[in-house]
Amino acid sequence: MNDSAMGSELDESPPLPDKVIAIHEALAEAKIPHAFGGALALAYYAEPRATIDIDVNVFAPVKRWREAIDALTQLGVATGDLDPTALERDGQCRLWWGNNAVDLFFAYDPIHEEMKKQARRVPFGDTTLTILAPEHLVVCKARFDRRKDWLDIEQMLIATDDLNLEAIEGWLTKMVGATDPRLTRLAELKSELAASE
């Protein structure tokens, strides 16, 4: 996603935790089911890491994108650089709220219905948020296939006792194919961790 839209001026928008709560409340008020992913969800399953991004899985088809965008625009999220054609093609977009990226991922695959069903309610400040289940967070991170994602996956494999590896492998196979190198990397990581116990 393009980072060029980020404002370089002093960010006078609310702090990140307040933005997360505001996004949650705005989408809930618009009756748009959603769950947070990324580093925010990771913090509930493994060692937290710093982030300035807000990843939101929107459990609605991409044709409802205007409803989600309208809800966020009212908060002060910048949507002027949004490319509707790319959003409809890719099922995702990056917006900016001050210096924080807000990444929206819309539903287009059967896994997204499972994500919605298995999302977990967690405490966040004085409220409660919905986050992705750990298995679905691992699948998302494996699909992105960045170095930091594999570090996060390793931490989750170590710290999350009840992680359903069979479900992770099943969904990843459906989404990327049985011969994809990401499945090999996941298997190697599991073996390395098992050998170190």
Predicted feature locations:
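Compositionally biased terminal segments of proteins
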Residues: M1-E197
